[in-house]
Amino acid sequence: MSFPVEVLAGIAIELQRGIGHQDRFQRLITTLRQVLACDASALLRYESRQFIPLAIDGLAQDVLGRRFTLEGHPRLEAIARAGDVVRFPADSDLPDPYDGLIPGQESLKVHACVGLPLFAGQNLIGALTLDAMTPEQFEVFSDEELRLVAALAAGALSNALLIEQLESQNMLPGSSGVFEPIKETHMIGLSPAMTQLKKEIEIVAGSDLNVLIGGETGTGKELVAKAIHQGSPRAVNPLVYLNCAALPESVAESELFGHVKGAFTGAISNRSGKFEMADNGTLFLDEIGELSLALQAKLLRVLQYGDIQRVGDDRSLRVDVRVLAATNRDLREEVLAGRFRADLFHRLSVFPLFVPPLRERGDDVVLLAGYFCEQCRLRLGLSRVVLSPGARRHLLNYGWPGNVRELEHAIHRAVVLARATRAGDEVVLEEQHFALSEDVLPAPSAESFLALPACRNLRESTENFQREMIRQALAQNNHNWAASARALETDVANLHRLAKRLGLKD
């Protein structure tokens, strides 16, 4: 059987009709699935010894969130090494990466598979995969015909990557000015909220502006900081991380600015602080809202003048550091309450970013679940970890108060439970493997709600609510602060600090 000229022309036309790359890619693989009458098709990008799905048709949605490493998927490794059309026989010993991921056929193995490596010159840039439940599905198509399809797909992908590279070098009008393409390996999500966030990251990454990253706990603010650093001219230099919430007041200044020998008891040698470590690079200050006012003043001076002073030293050191800061607090409210310096807030928030909570990201929940399933599969040495349709619906219907971090923990816990109840190395996650309900966390009793004063302002009511939550967590965990922190899904240092601010401890 040969492709009619009209079919190839139709594929080429479809590649030009899309508004953006994603739309073109989707049109391509949808058209190919129809023309080849197969059950599933996928376009994958090759990067750092792994294949990243760009567009799929006929596969479960969570495939878009998975990252297929060559080491973990022998068929994809064979495609990457082949340099030409690869046909896998129905009795192939190599597991198919999409087994259990074709909707309606979850319990059946994929029988026929064709892999088409995609090249730009001599460089592997991606692959097309075609799968069918019928063993002889692709025998009617010659290798030459499939090479034509691969050439069309490679051209589309190569053009998209070239445009991305040109935009990253500020060579196109209206481009973002990003120094190099941002790798989106861990920035998973196609929702409007995440698409907007990625655009904003691209805009600010190539500049040298300080960035304030806001968002609820567990949304992935550290990943945003990493993406900004990777897309900046400073990417060749260090990205240094510091959690301000975990800093005891007595050592916070030394951690930030360093100290000299003899500056205080225990200072037995000179020590560089985080600012020195990040010189010519980027410093990420997580939970910036937890810094004391005294340290805020010293941080402001560094941002204003670019010099630091080690504890116990009279000399100043010049540093060139870009500061990225993150917080789950409303710093405007903190400024009004006198807990955060207004001048520091304005210095940090030159370009503010907001990471959306998971409940506002729609189907991204499923994509992220696929990513974590693949992580668990590799970590535990399983042949496959897939979500049942019921499990997908269950994940979509939950509110995720702990955001992406809670989803990650839920997937890991579900895999362990499912593995314990099923023999073999194949795991299917069902709804019953997830303990997702609004009463998972300790909740205030009805009596405690009634006991709260009804005429307080919002801040006072919020603080009363926080006090009640902490009291109940402590009571339910025998006043063990570490266990209470785990129950409330916060770190123990942050819980101690909050309890002290709320007057629950000295």
Curated annotation (Swiss-Prot):
ATP binds at residues 215-222, 278-287. Gene3D superfamilies: 1.10.8.60, 3.30.450.40, Homeodomain-like, P-loop containing nucleotide triphosphate hydrolases. NCBIfam families: PRK05022.1 (NF003451). This is Anaerobic nitric oxide reductase transcription regulator NorR. GO terms for molecular function: ATP binding; ATP hydrolysis activity; DNA binding; DNA-binding transcription factor activity. Pfam families: GAF (PF01590), Sigma54_activat (PF00158). The modification 4-aspartylphosphate is found at D57. One of its GO terms (biological process) is phosphorelay signal transduction system. InterPro entries: AAA+_ATPase, GAF, GAF-like_dom_sf, Homeodomain-like_sf, NorR, P-loop_NTPase, Sigma_54_int, Sigma_54_int_dom_ATP-bd_1. Required for the expression of anaerobic nitric oxide (NO) reductase, acts as a transcriptional activator for at least the norVW operon. Activation also requires sigma-54. Residues 481-500 bind DNA. It comes from the Bacteria. Residues 187-416 form the Sigma-54 factor interaction domain. Pathway: Nitrogen metabolism; nitric oxide reduction. Disulfide bonds: none annotated. Keywords: ATP-binding, DNA-binding, Nucleotide-binding, Phosphoprotein, Transcription, Transcription regulation.
